[in-house]
Amino acid sequence: MDHAKYGAHYLFDDGHIRDFLDDGRLDDVIRMAIDQHNVYQLRENLTPRQRLFCQLIRDADKIDIFRVYVLYMSQKKNIWNVDWADFENQPISDSVMAQARQGKLVRTQDKKTFMDFYVGALCLYFDLVYPRSRQLAREQGYFDKLLDFHSRNVDSEKKLDEIRCLVRKAETLPQPIFVDTMYKDM
């Protein structure tokens, strides 16, 4: 089940948003932010205000996902419904690594093994829009705990080292214009 679509349906189609808010003036922005928070790529036809709130919610969701993944991995919970047997020795598929090298999100349909899903979790970092989001992800420490995992598979460990370098490089790239400047007229 697509939890974002269901959340938007429950709140707006079933009317439960009124359990939380009496005023409907922001319904279109809130609905879009909920509906789009888990998509691979945001819709093109968003208004600047919708895009802002979608990006904020998406960043917050990714930061929370890092926490959840650390918790589940420490408890050996099978969050990705893949084979955990000997996961420290599993390979990282070429298609997943190609997306990581591009600093992109990994498409769900390309993930097959635990290590593919793990790399997909690391690549969420590349999709964080705002500098403060990256800062929070690092300050909270969950993303760093994910980065600290080491594989016993020599090829996978080389690829993980490459991803760690890509993360460091992403932190030194020029950041986009800050939110206050970008959306000051909204």
Task: Identify the residue ranges that each predicted region occupies.
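Active-site metal-coordination segments of metallo-dependent hydrolases
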Residues: 1-6, 24, 53
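An active-site-proximal "capping" alpha-helix that borders the catalytic cofactor pocket
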Residues: 2-16
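Generic alpha-helical structural context detector
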Residues: 9, 32-35, 55-58
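Divalent metal-dependent phosphate-bond-processing catalytic cores, especially two-metal-ion Mg2+/Mn2+ enzymes
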Residues: 16-18, 39-186
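Short, well-structured alpha-helical segments
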Residues: 24-38
